[in-house]
């Protein structure tokens, strides 16, 4: 489970797959991008302020070790899904729902691709709500971090979501540290939202 690798202060090398552009019609579609290589690059040893008033956490992992995962696309105006056999990463996150449940005969992870157009958002929500698996759980990764927490890093930040193979939900704050370079500002395990509450939020 890669949540043990993506601990606070861990440095990673990674190029996020590009956002996929398709017709924005609310459809539920399979994710198309493969995962790009993510590698552990030690720990961030720079002077910390705010969130980082603590010693660096050292994770015993060889430098340049791969961090294996499946990538789930964000497809604006659609809900993308991927079959879950391993840990799944997706992002960057702003306000989208990430969900997990049985769909088309197997366990899937979903990224509901909301956009700034409310008409399209209503389509996306209505379509996904109608197909919401009976065992669905979900979370909103961006809600895990406050503006103050992000500002305390003194870095440009983005959020990625992790759904572990065992069904755990995590929100990971990434701090930009150069082209293709990040360090983990923090990781939070997020309690799942269950189907009745998801239905209400998608109404």
Language-model features, listed with the residues they occupy:
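Active-site microenvironment for binding and transforming phosphate-containing groups
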Residues: 1-203
């Amino acid at each position: 489970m890669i949540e043990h690798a993506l601990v606070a202060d861990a440095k990673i090398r990674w190029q996020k797959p590009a956002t996929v552009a398709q017709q924005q019609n609310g459809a539920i579609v399979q994710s198309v991008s493969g995962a790009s290589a993510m590698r552990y690059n030690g720990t961030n040893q720079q002077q910390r302020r705010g969130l980082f008033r603590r010693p660096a956490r050292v994770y015993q992992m060889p430098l340049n070790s791969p961090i294996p995962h499946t990538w789930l696309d964000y497809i604006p105006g659609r809900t993308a899904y991927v079959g879950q056999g391993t840990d799944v990463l997706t992002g960057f996150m702003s306000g989208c729902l990430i969900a997990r449940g049985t769909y088309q005969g197997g366990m899937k992870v979903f990224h509901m691709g909301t956009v700034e157009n409310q008409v399209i958002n209503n389509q996306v929500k209505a379509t996904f709500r109608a197909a919401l698996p009976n065992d669905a759980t979900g979370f909103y990764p961006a809600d895990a971090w406050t503006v103050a927490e992000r500002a305390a890093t003194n870095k440009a930040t983005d959020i990625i979501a992790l759904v572990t193979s065992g069904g755990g939900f995590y929100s990971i704050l990434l701090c930009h540290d150069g082209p293709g370079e990040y360090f983990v500002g923090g990781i939070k395990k997020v309690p799942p939202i269950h189907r009745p509450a998801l239905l209400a939020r998608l109404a």
